[in-house]
A protein has these predicted regions:
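Basic, polyanion-binding surface patches
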Residues: 1-174
Length: 174
């Protein structure tokens, strides 16, 4: 029997890939948050959407600089995913707290996270007010991945990409 869902409807769309969303301030101060709300919306031109809470420091920075990077981790970075999802970067250096090393991105000022197996650099072309979140539409400026974890353009199971199941549950496939 099907049960009517009245709250947390988005859980029906899980699992979703858990990733690091990096941004930067106008003064070049880097920031990172854990995110799972992203989706491609166009192949040509390549466009992705990330949805971020309006009250977050990350949303503030993305609105200021109009750019972000999606950094795709493996299970080796699960601890850092938890840390970056629990605290604000407004007053804390989450990179230091989580033991993450940053690398200069290829095309944007927002940083890339070392140890991630994929990166999607984006420039925001549209922001939509979507309830408690902003939906940032990002034109993909550059995308690259560790080829040892890709086969025919798809992730292999060896990449062990974390999946967010909803709430505080994250798993990965082997």
């Amino acid at each position: 029997m099907l049960k009517q869902i009245k709250s947390d409807i988005y859980h029906l769309l899980h699992p979703k890939m858990a990733f690091f969303l990096t941004s930067v301030s106008k003064n070049d101060k880097p920031n990172v948050m854990t995110c799972a709300w992203a989706t491609p919306v166009s192949e040509e031109p390549p466009v992705v959407i990330v949805c971020v809470s309006k009250e977050s420091y990350t949303a503030e920075l993305i609105k200021q600089t109009k750019e972000f990077v999606i950094n795709i981790p493996t299970k080796k970075l699960l601890g850092a995913l938890w840390i970056c999802g629990k605290i604000s970067g407004r007053d804390t250096d989450k990179f230091k707290r989580a033991g993450l090393k940053i690398i200069k991105a290829k095309k944007v000022k927002s940083p890339v996270i070392d140890g991630c197996v994929g990166h999607i650099e984006c420039k925001v072309w549209k922001t939509v007010d979507a309830g408690e979140c902003y939906a940032f539409f990002g034109n993909v400026i550059s995308a690259y991945a560790d080829e040892k974890y890709m086969r025919n353009g798809l992730w292999t199971k060896e990449a062990e990409i974390p999946l967010h199941l909803g709430g505080a549950r994250i798993v990965y496939f082997r």
